[in-house]
From Swiss-Prot:
SUPFAM superfamilies: Metallo-dependent phosphatases. It comes from the Bacteria. NCBIfam families: apaH, PRK00166.1. Its EC number is 3.6.1.41. Keywords: Hydrolase. It catalyses: P(1),P(4)-bis(5'-adenosyl) tetraphosphate + H2O = 2 ADP + 2 H(+). GO terms for molecular function: bis(5'-nucleosyl)-tetraphosphatase (symmetrical) activity. It holds the Pfam family Metallophos. Gene3D superfamilies: 3.60.21.10. It comes from Xanthomonas axonopodis pv. citri (strain 306). Residues 297-314 have a biased composition (Low complexity). It is an enzyme of class 3 (hydrolase). This is Bis(5'-nucleosyl)-tetraphosphatase, symmetrical. Transmembrane segments: none annotated. The gene is apaH.
Length: 314
């Protein structure tokens, strides 16, 4: 039995299939951890969502910002839905849309396996959050998403403010939690997210730090695997394993085996895109701050959503 974490798929169905073949995925005994952003931009979002849904008995999914945006689109009127990009429109107009979206809405913001020693999130954690606190706050929002009032949450989750504070309540609290789990890259030592800074470390504004290097952060008792930040490339540092390697931008799709002492990395080439949009960052070559052993690499080396800022960005 093997446990594999896989980076952001973003609607790259063919590439996902190639990666599953490369790791010799066997649903009878293996488990997949998907780091979120299953859909959008890759052109095959419906096929990708159907694939992951078909593997639901053999996989774990955490929600990314693009997944939440898809859920928000699915909760709108049909007239509003027709304004979204063709990749997501195919999902909300599909015959099996209700089954797919209802299943997606039941997924987590954070997944923890303490026996294995890992936590999976999409983007980041507040500097002062222990893994136990992160689980608790994730469950708060998951209960809202899975409950009867989820449409109100999806309408109110957009916006960059407020920053996280334990005293927050209502939709302000839910929005702050969602932004940390699904949009975070850089933050201040007090945990204020900088949503406009998306490049590689060293390009950010003064006073900002990668969320996993911010001064004063708590020590965490689990290794963390995440996606979201394609500009980082493959990065392993401070107990964090960032594996969004920009498959949708012409980078690679990455799988990381979690159940071995020596981390094993497997990659396949991503979409053959020469230049990402100007609003996106081209992924760097894999970046590791600690030596990675046991590598097995095949290669070396938002969608139209509400006009307000929110989970679709990045």
């Amino acid at each position: 039995m093997s446990v594999w974490a896989i980076g952001d798929l973003q609607g790259c169905y063919d590439i996902t299939q190639r990666l599953l073949e490369k790791i010799n995925f066997d649903p009878a005994q293996d488990t997949l951890w998907f780091c979120g952003d299953l859909v959008n931009r890759g052109g095959q979002s419906l096929e990708t969502l159907r694939l992951v849904h078909s593997l639901r008995a053999h996989s774990v999914v955490v929600l990314g910002n693009h997944d939440l945006s898809l859920l928000a689109i699915g909760a709108r009127s049909e007239e509003e839905q027709r304004k979204v990009n063709p990749d997501l429109l195919r999902i909300v107009m599909a015959e099996d849309r209700d089954a797919l979206l209802d299943w997606l809405r039941m997924q987590k913001l954070a997944h923890v396996d303490r026996e294995l020693g890992w936590m999976m999130i999409h983007a980041g954690l507040a500097p002062k959050w222990t893994t136990q606190m992160a689980e608790k706050h994730a469950r708060e929002v998951e209960q809202q998403l899975q409950g009867g009032g989820y449409r109100k949450l999806l309408r109110n989750m957009y916006g960059d403010q407020p920053g996280w504070s334990p005293g927050l309540s209502g939709y302000d609290r839910s929005r702050a939690i969602i932004n940390l789990f699904t949009r975070m890259r850089y933050c201040t030592p007090r945990g204020r997210i900088a949503t406009d800074d998306k490049g590689t470390p060293g390009t950010q504004a003064q006073g900002l730090y990668p969320w996993f290097e911010v001064p004063g952060r708590v020590e965490r008792d689990l290794k963390i695997v995440c996606g979201h930040w394609s500009a980082l490339g493959l990065t392993i540092t401070q107990g964090v394993h960032a594996i969004d390697t920009g498959a949708v931008w012409g980078g690679k799709l990455t799988a990381l085996q979690l159940d071995t002492d020596e981390l094993r990395v497997v990659q396949v080439p991503g979409n053959p895109i020469t230049h990402p949009p100007k609003t996106a960052q081209r992924p760097r070559q894999p970046r590791r701050r600690q030596r990675q052993r046991g590598g097995d690499q095949a290669q070396t080396g938002p969608a139209p959503t509400p006009a307000s800022t929110g989970p679709a960005g990045g």
